[in-house]
Amino acid sequence: MGYGAGRDKYEPAATSEQGGKKKKGKGKGKEKDMDELKKEVTMEDHKLSLDELHRKFGTDMQRGLTTARAAEILARDGPNALTPPPTTPEWVKFCRQLFGGFSMLLWIGAILCFLAYGIQAAMEEEPQNDNLYLGVVLSAVVIITGCFSYYQEAKSSKIMESFKNMVPQQALVIRSGEKLSINAEEVVLGDLVEVKGGDRIPADLRVISSHGCKVDNSSLTGESEPQTRSPDFTNENPLETRNIAFFSTNCVEGTARGIVVNTGDRTVMGRIATLASGLDGGRTPIAIEIEHFIHIITGVAVFLGVSFFILSLILQYTWLEAVIFLIGIIVANVPEGLLATVTVCLTLTAKRMARKNCLVKNLEAVETLGSTSTICSDKTGTLTQNRMTVAHMWFDNQIHEADTTENQSGASFDKSSPTWTALSRVAGLCNRAVFQAGQENTPILKRDVAGDASESALLKCIELCCGSVRDMREKNHKVAEIPFNSTNKYQLSVHKNANPSESRYILVMKGAPERILDRCTSIILQGKEQPLDEELKDAFQNAYLELGGLGERVLGFCHLALPDDQFPDGFQFDTEEVNFPTENLCFVGLISMIDPPRAAVPDAVGKCRSAGIKVIMVTGDHPITAKAIAKGVGIISEGNETVEDIAARLNIPVNQVNPRDAKACVIHGTDLKDMTEEQIDDILRHHTEIVFARTSPQQKLIIVEGCQRQGAIVAVTGDGVNDSPALKKADIGIAMGIAGSDVSKQAADMILLDDNFASIVTGVEEGRLIFDNLKKSIAYTLTSNIPEITPFLIFIIANIPLPLGTVTILCIDLGTDMVPAISLAYEQAESDIMKRQPRNPKTDKLVNERLISMAYGQIGMIQALGGFFTYFVILAENGFLPWTLLGIRVNWDDRWTNDVEDSYGQQWTYEQRKIVEFTCHTSFFISIVVVQWADLIICKTRRNSVFQQGMKNKILIFGLFEETALAAFLSYCPGMDVALRMYPLKPTWWFCAFPYSLIIFIYDEVRKLIIRRSPGGWVEKESYY
């Protein structure tokens, strides 16, 4: 689109809101403002005559405002700048990480631990420090992971900051008859401003005089061609009329004078920026999922805690003991390691995506992309290459195809015809575009050009086919030129002819094909000039319609050899009082151009379709062009017709076709303006392939909201300022890193560093993968909760010595389980990842009943059995047989009782009993590690067999070894008996849990086999999470 990095110098981007999306005040006033902004731009200034303008603004059309008056207005209206969006102070961002969602659960756990320790300290003379340790560790976990997440987002913010090139803008104003260059912020309402090619328009201007002035409106309206600006009132719609130049667009060529009619936030651009910053972005799907998950876990924890609190009172424990149990059970239910796991998983994916050219601004957006069900994509630069390229030529009465591929591997045409020589000469000479200096070694297609998009395309095409255009221009020196203007719609130049066998001067002309043809009486065929008859005019008309129907921009070319007798050497050509012929010329041919699709896009759109994602094109461009590109990239697939296509095929009027018969539809912005919400919903519901053309920024927003009403999770791509409201409103906004404006980058959640649509599909795959892998990590982490909680419950109910201590639970959650849980984030995708429909956020949750039933009810129970088996084996080896343990707890824990008898009549002192108890804690811990081996392996897949998936995940294999080594270290390292009360085990005790590990593996393989054999059956419904 625009002209490279020179765009967007001073958008409200100096301060920006990274991280979470902004929340909207609930006030009615805010909603009213939003509705105001959603309306189309209203403006009357373009309809006023110069006298009325003078009366309204008090501006002298020659001398401008007086300096004193300008100062008054500046004091009244404030500076001409956009209000920066409210920013979040760094400390607030940090607190959000520390106290958001999951962290709160751990904070509550920590407070409960300190509370329990306080109660124990008040009750006992020598209280155990377990709860104190636990509280400290939990607090540390939250603080460390909070710092980690904050650092991650701060890093993205830094990259964002580097996008901003804040250069103070200058403007040329006329005040009291003198030209002054002032800071653009000091421009006021009614100022007389002068702009020239290369300037940024400093405010909304009503043009009062112009000379060949063209502006690049692409960042505002999405039109890729520069638009002419003149004093004429040409359209009721202020965005379409020629006499208004908009703030922050670029003047590409020519000069103009205008009166400032809006400044700062009141400009059209300012309204859009306000619209974007005022929108409520909403919570990300993953944030909603994690909240849902916290609800489940908290629910389970509180339910168990309260149940056992009541039970312990019934079993005649004291109130204080019951409170300690309540707190213990709630804390044991909290998966301490999960917060870190989720953060690390999202970070890893964000890093992986950055390598694939997707910069993720806030971590949660990674997953949102995976649940996307609709992508509203901009056309220019995202689906297309963002460079006009010659696509076809028509000469010698036939259409030739040019090569539009990025690496020139496509079609070639016959370059030997003398007509092509003539056509290429006209296209090269009647052309003001030039290559910028110092690019001799750059490939021709990659070179930067000074000139408008169409001329650049011609220049590159001729340079590729015929060699140096510069040499051609030097040989055929230009002696006169009439630049293109909107009234006569042609560009003409006269050159000295380098060919001695032809006339001394040659006139070359290009322009709108029908205008050029009207000026011609002859045509070149096979190098010979022939009269232009009706048959050839029909052939021209057919070719013109065919190329135009492909959505291409067509130009006509003609020339005339000026006779030597009338135009001797040194003849003075006058371009004002034209003293040379501009009629009866000789037509040479047509050349058509298009911004061609990127090579990887059709494949990417196909992938989206098989992944159940609907791709909608939303563009400011012409409907015919939009439809042609949509067909080219597969957004409208082969064989699918629009209402117009059906009408043409059946030869009936469009209004007789039933819209439901057409799968595809192309909707014009002006039609969209008059539609009700119901009509928009109807279109989105009944058409699978949709293109919106000639849309305004406000309409883009309406389209996004329409999709969201259908329950879709919407991703929006865009690069212009005009896209920012939609980017903000969408579930995930994707801005372009190269062509994108600062406002759009700021509104987006993700930035495509290579501007390529295909990168989005990679992102979708990564997003789905992270969701799958998070599920696997959570399933793995939650499973060990059961063998951690059940010992506590049995301890209360059966009055046996405590099988597993608090410190050992921490060693599992924050020690042995951490690396394996994170390693699941590296798991490769299962085969169906891009073949299934997008997940439904309402029904397909991150943690659902089936996952809880698998983790808690099935695998977790087997694990608990393994732990208790080990516990009973060790106690039995020490003389306490299982049935003698019932009800022994009170004596066992009494430090003054030193004569507790075992099954063989031996007496045990308090110290000896405790050593056996702590050895049991260690063995229970080791047995959980052993059964978690199997759990980790079965969590690798949800449907495939582990044998199909293979053990390619090196991190996971490392995780298996790491957790085993850590467990052995904690058990055998000298000094652990004092620090963590962990004691060395006999080697045979490691093997007690092996059979249970095997049972878990076999049980799950059989379950997955049944799911694969009978898809949709009972087992899948009950256990496929």
From Swiss-Prot:
UniProt superkingdom: Eukaryota
Transmembrane segments: 90-110, 134-154, 291-310, 323-340, 775-794, 805-825, 846-868, 921-940, 954-972, 988-1008
Annotated residues for binding of ATP: 489
EC number from the UniProt entry: 7.2.2.13
Entry-annotated residues carrying Phosphoserine: 16, 945
Cellular compartment(s): Cell membrane, Sarcolemma
One biological process term in Gene Ontology: potassium ion import across plasma membrane
Gene Ontology molecular function, alphabetical: ATP binding; ATP hydrolysis activity; metal ion binding; P-type sodium:potassium-exchanging transporter activity
Biased composition annotated in UniProt, kind: Basic and acidic residues: 1-11, 28-37
Residue span of region Interaction with phosphoinositide-3 kinase: 84-86
Residues annotated as binding Mg(2+): 719, 723
CDD domains assigned to the protein according to its UniProt record, in alphabetical order: P-type_ATPase_Na-K_like (cd02608)
GO cellular component: membrane; plasma membrane; sarcolemma; sodium:potassium-exchanging ATPase complex
Topology in membrane: Multi-pass membrane protein
Coarse class of the protein's main subcellular location: membrane
Active site per UniProt: 378
Residue numbers spanned by region Disordered: 1-37, 216-237
Family: Belongs to the cation transport ATPase (P-type) (TC 3.A.3) family. Type IIC subfamily.
Function: This is the catalytic component of the active enzyme, which catalyzes the hydrolysis of ATP coupled with the exchange of sodium and potassium ions across the plasma membrane. This action creates the electrochemical gradient of sodium and potassium ions, providing the energy for active transport of various nutrients.
Protein name: Sodium/potassium-transporting ATPase subunit alpha-1
Native source species: Xenopus laevis (African clawed frog)
Lineage of the organism: Eukaryota, Metazoa, Chordata, Craniata, Vertebrata
